């Protein structure tokens, strides 16, 4: 799985990752911070997980908290809100829709 596939993945079907092709085409070149600033928090979190840099997770948290009426206390809490737990193993195929 490539970074762009993971970042724009919307779910899984068996061992196939389902990727939002339109969203990926429009935003694939954006950095983690750029995704967060565009309001694409789920995608920004996925990008931060892919980078394996804790400071990117904190950056997403800061951007999120600066724009919401309901700030969260940690990047782990924000990840739970968006259903992100890390990079999944075993996605052998990519389906773009």
Per-region residue spans from a language model:
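Extended alpha-helical solenoid/arm regions of large eukaryotic scaffolding proteins
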Residues: 1-97
